[in-house]
Amino acid sequence: MARKDQISHRGPLSGNNRSHALNATKRKFNLNLQQITLKTASGKKIRLKVSAKTKKILRKWGHV
């Protein structure tokens, strides 16, 4: 599961680089992946790779 958010399942997006002459070359917009540790209801710790946006939402909901 490389370059994928393990909670929201979002992956990289594709687009173009644009020079001053407006030439277009393909590029990839990768997610800002972070590693977090969550506790399950049984007290077991699990490590997940999530995007910074997902981490921010989890912190807001009080899960991190």
Curated annotation (Swiss-Prot):
The domain of life is: Bacteria
Alphabetical UniProt keywords:
Ribonucleoprotein, Ribosomal protein
Species of the source: Mesomycoplasma hyopneumoniae (strain 232)
Q: Which NCBIfam families match?
A: L28
Gene that this sequence comes from: rpmB
InterPro entries in the record: Bacterial_rp_bL28 (IPR050096), Ribosomal_bL28 (IPR026569), Ribosomal_bL28/bL31-like_sf (IPR034704), Ribosomal_bL28_bact-type (IPR001383), Ribosomal_bL28_sf (IPR037147)
The protein depicted here goes by the name Large ribosomal subunit protein bL28
Q: One of this protein's GO BP terms?
A: translation
Instruction: Provide the leader sequence positions.
Output: none
Which Gene Ontology molecular function entries are recorded, alphabetically?
A: structural constituent of ribosome
* Keyword GTP-binding in record: no
Q: Where is this region: Disordered?
A: 1-23
User: What is a single cellular component term in the Gene Ontology annotation?
Assistant: ribosome
* KW Transport (keyword) present: no
